[in-house]
From Swiss-Prot:
Transmembrane segments: none
Source organism superkingdom: Bacteria
Gene: rplJ
MF term (GO), any: large ribosomal subunit rRNA binding
Cellular component per GO, a single term: ribonucleoprotein complex
BP term (GO), one: translation
Protein name: Large ribosomal subunit protein uL10
Role according to the record: Forms part of the ribosomal stalk, playing a central role in the interaction of the ribosome with GTP-bound translation factors.
Swiss-Prot/TrEMBL keywords: Ribonucleoprotein, Ribosomal protein, RNA-binding, rRNA-binding
Source lineage: Bacteria, Pseudomonadati, Pseudomonadota, Betaproteobacteria, Burkholderiales
Subunit structure, interactors included: Part of the ribosomal stalk of the 50S ribosomal subunit. The N-terminus interacts with L11 and the large rRNA to form the base of the stalk. The C-terminus forms an elongated spine to which L12 dimers bind in a sequential fashion forming a multimeric L10(L12)X complex.
Pfam family, one: Ribosomal_L10
Organism of derivation: Polynucleobacter necessarius subsp. necessarius (strain STIR1)
Gene3D superfamilies: 3.30.70.1730, 6.10.250.290
HAMAP family referenced in this protein's UniProt entry, alphabetically: Ribosomal_uL10
Length: 179
């Protein structure tokens, strides 16, 4: 059933609003994927905060017109599913993870930070850890010296409480004998 002009305007406005707040767009061909698999992909995308939609390419081009995503217009050919996200890597990660299990999903292009990405670029973007993962790694690195110091102080306190002899570190505090 063809869309009327009002429906097309609503779609362009909706996609345009998503693009306005997005950092990344990834395009993938979905030809031959069963509906239940696409439903799983949509649920996964929703969980990751990715706007995932099958669009007519002319409507997608019109929505991208005048935005940083306009360079993708040449890549908008064939039956495509569009992954749009404010998170720099979420859309690439969702589509790449799904493509690992579903051979018929073929990533064709992407755009991040105003730069057009080929298939290899999208795959590289998908391998970057998420912001939360990076923050937890940074926190682990920052807390490692503190926790190591706490373990050492705890061990010294336990030794003193048990009446064990002091470690070699106390000998260094003594003044050397004059010759």
């Amino acid at each position: 059933m063809p869309l009327n002009v009002q429906d097309k305007k609503a779609i362009v406005a909706d996609v345009g609003a998503q693009l306005a707040g997005a950092q990344t767009v990834v395009l993938a061909e979905y030809r031959g994927i069963p509906v239940e698999q696409l439903t799983k992909l949509r649920a996964s995308a929703r969980d990751q905060g990715v706007y995932l939609r099958v669009l007519k390419n002319t409507l997608a081009r019109r929505a991208a017109q005048g935005t940083q995503f306009e360079p993708l217009a040449d890549s908008m050919v064939g039956p495509l599913i569009y992954g749009i996200s404010a998170d720099p890597i979420a859309s690439a990660k969702v589509l790449q993870n799904f493509a690992k299990t579903q051979d018929k999903l073929v990533i064709t292009a992407g755009l991040y930070n105003g730069k057009l990405l080929d298939v290899a670029g999208v795959k590289a973007l998908a391998t970057i850890p998420s912001r939360d993962e990076l923050l937890s790694q940074l926190l682990g690195v920052m807390l490692a010296p503190v926790s190591a110091m706490a373990r050492v102080l705890g061990a010294v306190a336990a030794q003193k409480a048990a009446g064990a002899p002091a470690e070699a570190g106390t000998e260094a505090n003594e003044t050397p004998a004059a010759e």
